[in-house]
A protein has these predicted regions:
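A well-structured
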Residues: 1-198
Length: 198
């Protein structure tokens, strides 16, 4: 409701024009506080729609947030991980908060058990999680298209002023040198005489 109520703000500010708003910064030093906001507003001007279109997107965004909310409830409230057994046979609870600590244990059995505890539970819900992921992709594709972005990736990076080439170059560079990671894992397995690393 709040989004719908203030949806007129950006289109009306853009209608005032950059020249007029820039003059405010010289006339009133208190306006300097908002310089970054207006810079971003005019930089992304082509992605701001009319008041009517913004109102529709505000209503739709409320519904589209459900995908994120459903995953958040599942991940933070509903999913439970089985306890694992410690060195002395004691039960060790597994949670999101403890998982990283358990993976840093010097005991390979604790690391392995913690990994299996978490991922066996997620594995049970893989179809649900895949459906949520697909719905999220459709949401972002919808908003990217309506706001005249070339892709969902471009929309996601726009706020940080990051060109998509930075992202794709990063992925390409990782792929290019993946053989080094494979070699490292292979050497580590050999040194530890292990079939799998945990």
């Amino acid at each position: 409701q709040l989004d719908s109520a203030v949806v007129f703000e950006e289109p009306e500010l853009l209608a005032i024009g950059k020249k007029t708003i820039d003059s405010w910064f010289t006339q009133n030093m208190d306006m300097q506080l908002y310089k970054r906001y207006f810079y971003e507003l005019f930089r992304q001007q082509k992605h701001v729609l009319s008041k009517e279109e913004e109102a529709i997107l505000a209503d739709v965004s409320d519904m589209s947030a459900d995908v994120s909310n459903i995953f958040s409830m599942f991940n933070n409230a509903d999913i439970r991980f089985p306890s694992i057994e410690g060195k002395e046979g004691e039960k060790i609870p597994v949670s999101h908060g403890r998982y990283t600590l358990l993976l840093e244990s010097r005991d390979v059995n604790i690391r392995k058990s913690a990994f299996e505890s978490v991922y066996s539970q997620y594995g049970q819900y893989r179809n649900t999680l895949a459906a949520l992921y697909a719905a999220n992709l459709k949401n972002t594709a919808f908003f990217a298209k309506k706001r005249h972005y070339n892709s969902s990736l471009e929309m996601a990076l726009e706020g940080g002023e990051i060109p998509t080439s930075v992202y794709t170059n990063l992925i390409d560079t990782v792929h290019e040198h993946m053989d080094l990671m494979h070699r490292y894992v292979s050497l580590r397995k050999k040194a530890l005489k292990a079939e799998e690393l945990h």
